[in-house]
């Protein structure tokens, strides 16, 4: 039998991270409405049904996309069964992402598809038609479930339906009905053979009818076989004639094949003639083209001479480019010398810049020294002020907490402490006095109980417990009632005194807590004031003065930092300018050194190079104009443009010369090709004459083909007629064979049905008798188990009787203490609830499942105090008597805690539901 071991919930409704360890015995899950108690049972139900829960579509917590339920169960032998379901929110509902079953550390299911079958097999529920419904009615009972079950016990038809579901009787009835619907075979007329719901006489009549049909089919098979043999003989004669005609057709087809080969040869010869004629035309075309090209050789040689004259100007273009390159280099040297001379002029301000930079750096060092000193003073004062502010804030917070309404209020803390000491002493004295009074009342009650025992044990000769005199029976009973009533009153008074004492001690404990809080606040206040004095502040006014001085230091620091920034910027600018001047002078000297010019000769060298550049430029312009005239270039933008156009013109001349050379070479080649083409044309003409003679011969042979084809067609038509006749015979034979096979199949099916008919009828009768026996056995077991459970409680209902009425309805009668029957409607509501509980326990034992726990959701809801106390006492008795290994009750009534072995308190906070268990 499996009981609950551990439950873990991750993001399940209001439970974000909940773990509960269950133990055997009576477990009470207590909490206010909406705290999340019922979610615990819903999660257990979801794990073992499987995946059935009242609010499955919203089981995952809000603002969460995934959730997880882990349930561990332990068997009587100590085997651990672990069920883990991982949920995911998808669309508008909740889907099971993974469903894992682990037994003794071995995984036996990991997908939702295999989860259901495995959990039913492990928990012994595979024989039930609807295990989920059974668990919800008899294992995990929702709010109002016991009352509903008590009402079902009074309704014979509904009770029958419930027992049918638990026993699986509906499946047995369906199995019996299925035997009647099973097709045992097919009769020879094609109708299915079934038992249905026929009587024995009708079943025997049906058997004889089926046997006669089988014999009739056997006669039809013999007649069809005789006709099939006649058709086979006729078919053999037709096939012999067809073979003779096929031999003649093959000879004709062979002759036609030879003629078709000749036709192909004729086509090939014709194609070769066309090919040779096309080849001759191509040769003539190429010959005419070659002759036209040969005629243009003289014009090409004249044009080649003109182009060679222009190509000789390439040397002058190269000379002009060289002069331009020399002029460009001279211009670059002039530019470099001119730039170096200008930079040397500017670098004369270098000493002035160096002096200004050193002065700015000295001022910057002085400013940084002042900033460092002021920063040190500011940091020390800022630390003292910050610590002082924090201490003053804490002092105010402590004073505010101390002056709160539930501590000191407007009184001084010392006065409140003195008053609390007095009140606590009074409450403790009062509690001791009340304890003494309660003990005295308990002792008096025990004395009365002892006297009552003496009266009851004395039997017929009762004596007065005070004087020992013999009492008449009526007087003895009156005294016993008086003692019993007085003892009950004294016990009640003792409990009230004990409750008052406990209340006084609780109040004293609360006041002691309040006193300790005030003492802690006073100690904290003294520590804070001492810390303020250690910082050098005797009063808050000293702190305000320090804050004003701190602001002045901050303003002074800001002014010094602004001065520092301006001086740093000035130093950077002067340094950059100094570096730039030094670099300019260095670069100028490097340029002059690279050109081999001394610093003092730079100006004179600049004038000399300028004069040389102008002279070279005039020479270059003269040569460029002459070249443009000879090449025919009329317009150009610059010397570079002229050189580019001259190079393009010379490239065009070179290309045209190359093309002319190629054309001249081609013309010489064409002269040789023309002679070759004339010879090829003569050879093609000879081959044409030979092919035309062969074509004439082939056409004469091919003309015989039409006569042979006519005879072949005649033979083929005769063969087609024979094939058609053979096909008709084959179809008729096929139909006969099919019909014979069908009749044999019908005969075999009928014979098979005859073999199964009588055994199936006997099986149906046996199953009907087994169902009735099992049902009567279940009712007897339920009655015995319920009476055994009820005998353990002191109830007005001593037992029950369960009987089957007409129309298969179940009636439950209550048996009073005097042995008289009582209808369930006359039984009190509390006793009907106990009957429902005993029915659930008896049904679980009769079904034989492997779940050893019972869970009830709010069973005490809508009950008055007396009925609630009675029900809880019964639940406690069920646990103590061992009628169920583990009883879990979810309720919002706090008084249930006094009866439970394990108490789990469920509370709801902003962070979700919390569960704290006391064992």
UniProtKB/Swiss-Prot annotation:
Pfam families: AAA_23, Rad50_zn_hook, SMC_N
Domain of life: Archaea
Reported cofactor(s): Zn(2+)
Gene Ontology terms for molecular function: ATP binding; ATP hydrolysis activity; zinc ion binding
Entry domain remark: The two conserved Cys that bind zinc constitute the zinc-hook, which separates the large intramolecular coiled coil regions. The 2 Cys residues coordinate one molecule of zinc with the help of the 2 Cys residues of the zinc-hook of another Rad50 molecule, thereby forming a V-shaped homodimer.
Sites where the protein binds Zn(2+): 464, 467
SUPFAM superfamilies: P-loop containing nucleoside triphosphate hydrolases, Rad50 coiled-coil Zn hook
Similarity remark: Belongs to the SMC family. RAD50 subfamily.
Alphabetized UniProt keyword annotations: ATP-binding, Coiled coil, DNA damage, DNA repair, Hydrolase, Metal-binding, Nucleotide-binding, Zinc
Coiled-coil regions listed in the entry: 208-268, 315-379, 414-458, 486-515, 541-595, 635-749
InterPro entries linked: P-loop_NTPase (IPR027417), Rad50/SbcC_AAA (IPR038729), Rad50_ATPase_archaeal (IPR022982), RecF/RecN/SMC_N (IPR003395), Zn_hook_RAD50 (IPR013134)
Subunit-level organization: Homodimer. Forms a heterotetramer composed of two Mre11 subunits and two Rad50 subunits.
GO-annotated biological processes: double-strand break repair
Cofactor stoichiometry and binding remark: Binds 1 zinc ion per homodimer.
Positions annotated to bind ATP: 33-39, 143
Domain annotation Zinc-hook: ranges: 417-516
UniProt-recorded name of the protein: DNA double-strand break repair Rad50 ATPase
Function: Part of the Rad50/Mre11 complex, which is involved in the early steps of DNA double-strand break (DSB) repair. The complex may facilitate opening of the processed DNA ends to aid in the recruitment of HerA and NurA. Rad50 controls the balance between DNA end bridging and DNA resection via ATP-dependent structural rearrangements of the Rad50/Mre11 complex.
PANTHER family assigned to the protein according to its UniProt record, in alphabetical order: ABC TRANSPORTER ABCH.3
């Amino acid at each position: 039998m499996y009981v609950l071991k551990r439950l873990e919930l991750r993001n399940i409704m209001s439970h974000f991270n909940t773990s509960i360890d269950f133990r055997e015995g009576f477990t009470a899950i207590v909490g206010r409405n909406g705290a999340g108690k019922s979610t615990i049972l819903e999660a257990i139900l979801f794990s073992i049904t499987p995946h059935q829960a009242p609010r499955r579509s919203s089981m995952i917590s809000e603002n969460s996309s995934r959730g997880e339920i882990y349930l561990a169960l332990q068997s009587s032998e100590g085997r651990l069964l672990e069920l883990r379901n991982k949920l995911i929110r998808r669309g508008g509902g909740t889907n099971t992402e993974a469903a894992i079953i682990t037994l003794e550390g071995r995984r036996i299911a990991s997908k939702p598809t295999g989860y259901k079958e495995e959990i039913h097999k492990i928990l012994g529920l595979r024989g039930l038609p609807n295990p989920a419904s059974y668990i919800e009615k008899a294992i995990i009972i929702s709010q109002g479930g016991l009352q509903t079950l008590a009402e079902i016990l009074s309704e014979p038809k509904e009770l029958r339906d419930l027992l049918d579901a638990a026993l699986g009787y509906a499946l047995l009835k369906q199995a019996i009905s299925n035997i009647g619907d099973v097709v045992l075979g097919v009769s020879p007329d094609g109708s299915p053979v079934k038992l249905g719901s026929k009587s024995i006489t009708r079943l025997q009549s049906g058997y004889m009818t089926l046997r006669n049909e089988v014999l009739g089919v056997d006669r039809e098979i013999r007649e069809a076989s005789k006709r099939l043999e006649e058709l086979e003989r006729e078919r053999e004669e037709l096939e012999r004639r067809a073979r003779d005609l096929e031999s003649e057709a093959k000879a004709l087809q062979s002759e036609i094949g030879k003629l078709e080969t000749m036709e192909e040869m004729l086509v090939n010869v014709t194609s070769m003639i066309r090919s040779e004629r096309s080849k001759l035309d191509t040769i003539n075309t190429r010959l005419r083209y070659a002759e036209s090209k040969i005629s243009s050789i003289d014009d090409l040689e004249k044009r080649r001479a003109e182009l060679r004259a222009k190509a000789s100007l390439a040397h002058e273009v190269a000379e002009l480019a060289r002069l331009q390159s020399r002029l460009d280099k001279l211009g670059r040297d002039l530019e470099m010398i001119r730039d170096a001379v200008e930079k040397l002029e500017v670098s004369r301000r270098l000493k002035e810049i160096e002096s200004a930079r050193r002065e700015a750096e000295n001022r910057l060092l002085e400013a940084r020294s002042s900033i460092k000193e002021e920063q040190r003073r500011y940091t020390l004062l800022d630390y003292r002020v910050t610590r002082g502010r924090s201490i003053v804030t804490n002092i105010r917070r402590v004073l505010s907490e101390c002056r709160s309404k539930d501590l000191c209020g407007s009184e001084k803390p010392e006065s409140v402490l003195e008053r609390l000491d007095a009140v606590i002493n009074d409450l403790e004295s009062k509690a001791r006095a009340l304890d003494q009074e309660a003990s005295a009342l308990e002792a008096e009650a025990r004395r009365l109980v002892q006297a009552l025992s003496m009266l009851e044990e004395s039997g017929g000769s009762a004596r007065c417990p005070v004087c020992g005199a013999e009492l008449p029976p009526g007087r003895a009973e009156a005294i016993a009632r008086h003692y019993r009533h007085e003892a009950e009153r004294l016990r009640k008074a003792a409990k009230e005194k004990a409750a008052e004492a406990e209340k006084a001690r609780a109040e004293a404990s609360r006041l002691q807590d309040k006193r300790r809080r005030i003492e802690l606040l006073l100690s904290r206040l003294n520590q804070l004031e001492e810390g303020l004095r250690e910082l050098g502040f005797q009063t808050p006014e000293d702190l305000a003065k320090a804050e004003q001085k701190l602001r002045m230091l901050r303003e002074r620091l800001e002014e010094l930092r602004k001065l520092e920034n301006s001086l740093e910027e000035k130093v950077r600018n002067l340094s950059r300018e100094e570096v730039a001047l030094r670099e300019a002078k260095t670069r100028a000297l490097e340029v002059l050194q690279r050109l081999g010019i001394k610093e003092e000769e730079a100006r004179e060298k600049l004038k000399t190079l300028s004069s040389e550049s102008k002279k070279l430029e005039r020479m270059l312009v003269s040569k460029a104009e002459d070249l443009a005239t000879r090449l025919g270039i009329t317009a150009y933008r610059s010397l570079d443009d002229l050189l580019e156009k001259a190079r393009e013109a010379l490239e065009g001349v070179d290309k045209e010369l190359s093309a002319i050379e190629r054309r001249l070479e081609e013309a010489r080649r064409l002269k040789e090709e023309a002679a070759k083409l004339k010879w090829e044309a003569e050879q093609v003409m000879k081959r044409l004459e030979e092919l035309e003679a062969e074509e004439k011969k082939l056409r004469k042979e091919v003309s015989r083909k039409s006569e042979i084809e006519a005879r072949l067609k005649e033979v083929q038509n005769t063969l087609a007629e024979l094939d058609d006749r053979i096909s008709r015979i084959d179809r008729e034979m096929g139909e006969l064979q099919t019909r014979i096979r069908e009749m044999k199949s019908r005969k075999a099916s009928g014979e098979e049905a005859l073999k199964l008919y009588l055994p199936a009828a006997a099986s149906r009768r046996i199953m009907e008798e087994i169902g009735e026996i099992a049902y009567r056995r279940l009712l007897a077991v339920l009655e015995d188990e319920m009476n055994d459970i009820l005998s353990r409680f002191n109830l007005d209902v001593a037992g029950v009787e369960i009987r089957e009425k007409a129309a298969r309805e179940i009636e439950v009668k209550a048996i009073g203490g005097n042995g008289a029957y009582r209808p369930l409607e006359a039984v009190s509501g509390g006793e009907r609830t106990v009957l429902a509980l005993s029915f659930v326990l008896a049904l679980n034992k009769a079904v034989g499942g492997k779940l050893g726990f019972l869970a009830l959701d709010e069973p005490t809801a809508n009950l008055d105090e007396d009925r609630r106390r009675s029900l809880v006492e019964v639940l406690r008795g069920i646990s103590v008597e061992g009628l169920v290994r583990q009883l879990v009750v979810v309720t919002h009534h706090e008084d249930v805690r006094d009866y439970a072995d394990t108490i789990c308190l469920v509370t709801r906070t902003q962070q979700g539901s919390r569960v704290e268990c006391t064992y």
